[in-house]
């Protein structure tokens, strides 16, 4: 069936309406999560997702994203183009129906989209509702159609034909400006757009995505013919590999006993390296499932079963009772799991966890077949993988024994560790704050200046271990790490339980110099590798102490960066009698100053640590904190231009 015939099949009557659009402007958070930075970019991704759905359906091969000045953004695809006929229910064009009626779209009609990221007919209308200006161009049936909306989806005039195009030239272009009477005054971040677009291109092999900053004349083009294989190679760049090539599995699972006759498309790419950590990222219909789900369970089911079968058959186990478990297969593993499902079921509105039972069966089946064949064809690599798993198991069992000994008082006594915790009096974890403070002097000032009812202080008096370079056993034996684990109360790694967290704000407070930045990075590396939910749930913050104290007579002001310092100086009438103190360390502030500038919940500035893209975060941590020197050198060279406030 050719494209023209498919275009005619996808028409106005395919658009089904579920409910109206009235609530979006009143309660935008219900639809896009927030009205800040994340919500702003969510608007863009809703439009991009529609274009990606056209690509997954086999009709679009290219998506173009253009960022214009003043936060105007445009998304163009070469898919079929929105239907332009009159909708029988609304008596308006299908384009206007899609863009002004919530839950109106072609995604509810299974004949048009076999898989999509969700009910994305919702997305286009929500973006229109939250835009001050919204324009759409549709190339379809040899015509160029156009419609404009203003002030939250109010049509300026009905859809009209403004030109002719060739019969085979099709697609949709949407251009919008967020409504800043509703959205917070945040800017689209070009780097964020680039990173997310690159991820989409990896997940949809052969799809070309062009991202352009029109004002700065910067153009990035992403197209990966290798798809997930290229993705894993990128994540493993600069790492010492155990498996020289990427193991790849791809297939379509369709068993009427499990899938009701509908296809589940599975792709898995994986490769082992010599690191102690892992990077396992999963997606369902291009949506990152940060909390995993049934497809991840199927992935582990396959690894454990195939590895155990291979080890038993080839007599690689030393005893008959020896078995590889799920925890043993993770060390050094970089893997991307991606499934495409006709009817994905997610846990909650954030779509962080996939719940379809057939996804587990499908992933297990597709991966098992390919992995078993690969191991049998590559016995040396298979042996290296099994040995890696068994070594990981041996280390893990030793760690369990060490923890048990510690709990019985035979091992490390956490109560007598250096960096003694000065706890707060409140028992309510939701309002309790833990300041992890660099050095004794700053720790002393923080203890004296804090609000003792809700603020606890944990001074770091020794060296924090690099969790990227060292084994889990070595990490656990580090006294500073052990103190933090004890203070937080959650346990660590596989024993981590977020419900046992004693503080809902964990605030890293270090000096504003190179050493302070290094300590912050070491702590974040540890949290990311072994307590990642702390970051995912938004519990980790970076304190922002001032860089300058500016005294003019009796007037004292604090500047948190050089620009702020210049602004304060510019408004001072008497510039001759001004004293500027550049803080090199937290210890230079007395308790009152530290409270006023950095710890007072009413006036302080803090940065919340967030993970926008787990795979990118993983690459950055591995590059900066790993063993290999050359990738780190390259990263610093490429990103040095973005560095500020460097002490030389």
From Swiss-Prot:
It catalyses: ATP-dependent breakage, passage and rejoining of double-stranded DNA. Its EC number is 5.6.2.2. Mg(2+) 2 binds at residues 511, 513. One of its GO terms (molecular function) is ATP binding. The record marks 463, 466 as: Interaction with DNA. Pfam families: DNA_gyraseB (PF00204), DNA_gyraseB_C (PF00986), HATPase_c (PF02518), Toprim (PF01751). One of its GO terms (biological process) is DNA topological change. GO terms for cellular component: chromosome; cytoplasm. Mg(2+) 1 binds at residues 438, 511. Keywords: ATP-binding, Cytoplasm, DNA-binding, Isomerase, Magnesium, Metal-binding, Nucleotide-binding, Topoisomerase. InterPro entries: DNA_gyrase_B_C, GyrB, HATPase_C_sf, Ribosomal_Su5_D2-typ_SF, Ribsml_uS5_D2-typ_fold_subgr, Topo_IIA, Topo_IIA-like_dom_sf, Topo_IIA_B. Belongs to the type II topoisomerase GyrB family. Few gyrases are as efficient as E.coli at forming negative supercoils. Not all organisms have 2 type II topoisomerases; in organisms with a single type II topoisomerase this enzyme also has to decatenate newly replicated chromosomes. This is DNA gyrase subunit B. The gene is gyrB.
């Amino acid at each position: 069936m050719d494209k023209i015939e498919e275009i005619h099949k996808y028409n106005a009557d395919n658009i089904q309406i579920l409910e109206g659009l009235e609530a979006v402007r009143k309660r935008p958070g219900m639809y896009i999560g927030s009205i800040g930075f994340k919500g702003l970019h969510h608007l863009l991704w809703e439009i991009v997702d529609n274009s990606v759905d056209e690509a997954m359906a086999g009709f679009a091969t290219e998506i173009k994203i253009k960022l214009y000045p003043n936060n105007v953004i445009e998304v163009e695809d070469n898919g079929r183009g929105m239907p332009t006929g009159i909708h029988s229910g609304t008596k308006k064009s299908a384009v206007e129906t899609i863009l002004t009626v919530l839950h109106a779209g072609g995604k509810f009609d299974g004949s048009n989209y076999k898989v999509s990221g969700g009910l994305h007919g919702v997305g286009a209308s929500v973006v229109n509702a939250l835009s001050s200006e919204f324009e759409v161009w549709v190339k379809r049936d040899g015509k160029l159609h156009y419609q404009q909306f203003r002030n939250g989806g109010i049509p300026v005039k009905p859809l009209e034909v403004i030109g002719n195009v060739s019969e085979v030239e099709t697609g949709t272009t949407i251009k919008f400006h967020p409504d800043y009477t509703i959205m917070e005054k945040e800017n689209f971040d070009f780097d964020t757009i680039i990173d997310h677009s690159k991820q989409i291109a990896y997940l949809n092999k052969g799809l070309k995505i062009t991202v352009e900053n029109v004002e700065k004349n910067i153009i990035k083009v992403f197209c990966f013919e290798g798809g997930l294989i290229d993705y894993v190679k990128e994540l493993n760049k600069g790492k010492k590999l155990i498996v020289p090539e990427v193991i790849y599995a791809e297939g379509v699972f369709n068993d009427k006993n499990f899938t009701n006759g509908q296809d589940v498309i599975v792709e898995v790419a994986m490769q082992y390296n010599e690191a102690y950590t892992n990077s396992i990222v999963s997606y369902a219909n291009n949506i990152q499932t940060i909390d995993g789900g049934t497809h991840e369970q199927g992935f582990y089911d396959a690894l454990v079963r195939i590895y155990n079968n291979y080890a038993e058959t080839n007599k690689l186990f030393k005893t008959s009772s020896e078995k590889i478990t799920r925890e043993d297969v993770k060390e050094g593993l970089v893997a991307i799991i991606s499934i495409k499902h006709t009817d994905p079921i997610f846990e909650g509105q954030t779509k962080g966890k996939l719940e379809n039972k057939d996804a587990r069966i499908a992933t297990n089946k597709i991966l098992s077949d390919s992995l078993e064949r690969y191991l049998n064809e590559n016995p040396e690599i298979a042996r290296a993988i099994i040995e890696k798993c068994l070594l990981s198991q041996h280390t893990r069992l030793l760690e369990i024994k060490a923890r048990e000994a510690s709990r019985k008082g035979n091992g490390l006594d956490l109560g007598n560790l250096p960096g003694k915790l000065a706890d707060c009096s409140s028992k309510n974890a939701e309002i309790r704050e833990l300041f992890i403070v660099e050095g004794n002097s700053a720790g002393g000032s923080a203890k004296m200046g804090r609000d003792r009812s809700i603020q606890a202080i944990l001074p770091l008096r020794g060296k924090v271990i690099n969790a990227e370079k060292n084994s889990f056993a070595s990490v656990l034996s580090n006294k500073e790490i052990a103190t933090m684990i004890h203070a937080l109360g959650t346990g660590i790694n596989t024993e981590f339980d977020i419900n046992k967290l004693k503080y809902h704000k964990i605030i890293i407070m270090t000096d504003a110099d190179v050493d302070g930045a290094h300590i912050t990075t070491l702590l974040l590396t540890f949290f990311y590798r072994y307590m990642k939910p702390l970051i995912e749930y938004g519990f980790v913050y970076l304190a922002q102490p001032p860089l300058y104290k500016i005294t003019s007579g009796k007037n004292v002001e604090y500047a948190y960066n050089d620009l702020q310092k210049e602004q304060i100086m510019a408004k001072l009438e008497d510039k001759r009698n001004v004293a500027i103190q550049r803080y090199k360390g937290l210890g230079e502030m007395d308790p009152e100053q530290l409270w006023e500038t950095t710890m007072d919940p009413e006036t302080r500035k803090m940065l919340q640590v967030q993970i926008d893209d787990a795979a990118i975060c993983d690459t950055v941590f591995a590059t900066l904190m790993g063993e290999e020197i050359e990738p780190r050198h390259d990263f610093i060279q490429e990103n040095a231009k973005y560095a500020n406030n460097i002490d030389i």
